[in-house]
C-alpha cells in the first residue's frame, strides 16, 4: 500500500487489525456526530495564503513546559496502545523521541511506566484519570515521578464513560465478546502472531502493578467503569497539585469558564478536547471550542488541543485558532498498527513536511508567528460567532 497521508495509515490499520480493535480506536460515542465534526470543522478552517514573503528560513521548534520540541506536536495518551503493535507504547515512545517530541503514556496502557520510561532518552509525559481508588492514583504518581516523568496530563472529562455503540457490534463489548474477539484474531494471523503471541503480556501494566495481579482486556471495561468518580470537583485535585511538583496539564476543557477555573487552580496547561468524540456526543468540536477558550486564557497557561487532527495542515489550523501545541491520538495509532515504530516516525515526518508547506504559503516563519492572521477573514468571523 502506498502511504502518502494519515488517511492511508487508517486504511492499512483497518486491513491488519481485528475489527474489535480497529473500531475501538476508530469509533466514538453514541451516533458519532462529534467524532465526525472534529474532522470536518477543522478541515473547514480556511488558511490565508500569502506570497512573496521570503520564506527561506522556517523554524518549527518550540518550547513547552521547559522542553524543546522539534515541532509543536506530542503523542497523546491512548489506552490499549500495546494491543495495536507489539509492546506498542514502547514503539510509539521511541518514534516520538526519535522525532524530538514528547510521548504521553496512558493510565490504561498495556506497557507499564517502568517498561516505557527506560526505553527512551527524553522524559515522557504521563496521563492520569480521576478515579475513586485514590490509592491507585497516588501509587501511579509516585511511580511516574520515580521513572522521571516530567509532565502530568490529568484527564477530567470522564467522570462517567460515554456509551460507544460501535463497540457492541465489533466485539469489544456485547454478547459473546470474548468468543468473537478470538475468532477475529484467527482471521488476522499477522496481528495474532506479532501482538497476540509475541506481544504478551496483554494486561494493563500500570493497574496490574498496583493490584498485584494481571488486569486483562476482559477486566478493562469493568474495572474502569467501577472506578470513575462522578463526584469529582476542583477541590479534589488539590492534593495532586501539591504532590506533583512538575507541570500539570488539565485535559478535557471545552468551555471558557472551565479554562478560567484551570487558571485559578494553578494548572500549567490545558488540553482543549472532547476526548476524540468518545464521551458526550453533540458537544462542540475542539476546533469550534478553541477560539473562545484562547480569548479567555491565552498567555495565562499553555493551551494544547486534540481531536480531529490528521495532518500538518490541521496542526497549523489549531495553532492559528489559538493553541500552543497539539496532541495526536488516532492518527499515530493508525500508523503504529500499520507499521510499528517506523510507521509513527514516517507519519511525523509527513506532518512536519505538511506544516512546512502550510507555513510557507501562509507567510509564517516560526511557530510563534502562527496566529489568527494566518486564517481567512471568513474563518475568523466564524470563530468569533461561537464565542460566548
UniProtKB/Swiss-Prot annotation:
Keywords carried by this UniProt record: Cell inner membrane, Cell membrane, Flavoprotein, FMN, Membrane, Oxidoreductase
EC code: 1.1.-.-
CDD domains given in the database record: alpha_hydroxyacid_oxid_FMN
Subcellular compartments: Cell inner membrane
PROSITE patterns for this protein: FMN_HYDROXY_ACID_DH_1 (PS00557), FMN_HYDROXY_ACID_DH_2 (PS51349)
Binding site for FMN: 106, 127, 155, 251, 306-330
Domain annotation FMN hydroxy acid dehydrogenase: ranges: 1-380
Swiss-Prot/TrEMBL GO biological process terms: aerobic respiration; lactate metabolic process
Entries under InterPro entries matching the protein: Aldolase_TIM, Alpha-hydoxy_acid_DH_FMN, FMN-dep_DH, FMN_HAD, FMN_hydac_DH_AS, LldD
Entry binding sites for substrate: 24, 129, 164, 278
Names of required cofactors: FMN
Entry GO CC: plasma membrane
Catalytic center residues: 275
Gene3D superfamilies reported for this sequence: Aldolase class I
Catalytic activity field: (S)-lactate + A = pyruvate + AH2
Record membrane topology: Peripheral membrane protein
GO MF annotation terms: FMN binding; L-lactate dehydrogenase activity
Enzyme class, first EC level, given as a word: oxidoreductase
Disulfide bonds: none
Summary of the function given for this chain in its UniProt record: Catalyzes the conversion of L-lactate to pyruvate. Is coupled to the respiratory chain.
Family: Belongs to the FMN-dependent alpha-hydroxy acid dehydrogenase family.
Name of the molecule in the record: L-lactate dehydrogenase
Gene designation: lldD
Amino acid at each position: 500500500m502506498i502511504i502518502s497521508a494519515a488517511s492511508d495509515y487508517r486504511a492499512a490499520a483497518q486491513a491488519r487489525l481485528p475489527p474489535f480493535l480497529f473500531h475501538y480506536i476508530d469509533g466514538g460515542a453514541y451516533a458519532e456526530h462529534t467524532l465526525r465534526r472534529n474532522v470536518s470543522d477543522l478541515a473547514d478552517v480556511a488558511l490565508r495564503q500569502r506570497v512573496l514573503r521570503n520564506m527561506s528560513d522556517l523554524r518549527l521548534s518550540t518550547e513547552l513546559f521547559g522542553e524543546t520540541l522539534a515541532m509543536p506536536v506530542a503523542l497523546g495518551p491512548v489506552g490499549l496502545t500495546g494491543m495495536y503493535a507489539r509492546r506498542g507504547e514502547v514503539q510509539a515512545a521511541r518514534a516520538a523521541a526519535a522525532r524530538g517530541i514528547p510521548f504521553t503514556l496512558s493510565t490504561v496502557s498495556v506497557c507499564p511506566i517502568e517498561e516505557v520510561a527506560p526505553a527512551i532518552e527524553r522524559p515522557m509525559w504521563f496521563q492520569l484519570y480521576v478515579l475513586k481508588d485514590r490509592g491507585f492514583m497516588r501509587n501511579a504518581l509516585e511511580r511516574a515521578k520515580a521513572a522521571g516523568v516530567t509532565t502530568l496530563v490529568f484527564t477530567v472529562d470522564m467522570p462517567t464513560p460515554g456509551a460507544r455503540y460501535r463497540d457492541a457490534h465489533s466485539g469489544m463489548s456485547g454478547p459473546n465478546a470474548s468468543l468473537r474477539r478470538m475468532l477475529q484474531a484467527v482471521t488476522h494471523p499477522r496481528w495474532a502472531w506479532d501482538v497476540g503471541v509475541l506481544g504478551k503480556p496483554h494486561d494493563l501494566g500500570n493497574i496490574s502493578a498496583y493490584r498485584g495481579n494481571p488486569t486483562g482486556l476482559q477486566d478493562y471495561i469493568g474495572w474502569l467503569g467501577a472506578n470513575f468518580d462522578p463526584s469529582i470537583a476542583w477541590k479534589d485535585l488539590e492534593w495532586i497539585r501539591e504532590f506533583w511538583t512538575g507541570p500539570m496539564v488539565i485535559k478535557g476543557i471545552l468551555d471558557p469558564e472551565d479554562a478560567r477555573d484551570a487558571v485559578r487552580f494553578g494548572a500549567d496547561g490545558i488540553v482543549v478536547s472532547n476526548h476524540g468524540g468518545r464521551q458526550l456526543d453533540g458537544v462542540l468540536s475542539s476546533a469550534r471550542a478553541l477560539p473562545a477558550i484562547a480569548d479567555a486564557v491565552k498567555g495565562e497557561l499553555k493551551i494544547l488541543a486534540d481531536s480531529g487532527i490528521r495532518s500538518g495542515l490541521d496542526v497549523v489550523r489549531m495553532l492559528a485558532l489559538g493553541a500552543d501545541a497539539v496532541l495526536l491520538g488516532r492518527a499515530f495509532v493508525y500508523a503504529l498498527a500499520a507499521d510499528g515504530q517506523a510507521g509513527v516516525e514516517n507519519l511525523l515526518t509527513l506532518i512536519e513536511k505538511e506544516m512546512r508547506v502550510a507555513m510557507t504559503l501562509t507567510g509564517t516563519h516560526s511557530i510563534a508567528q502562527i496566529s489568527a492572521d494566518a486564517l481567512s477573514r471568513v474563518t475568523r468571523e466564524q470563530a468569533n460567532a461561537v464565542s460566548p
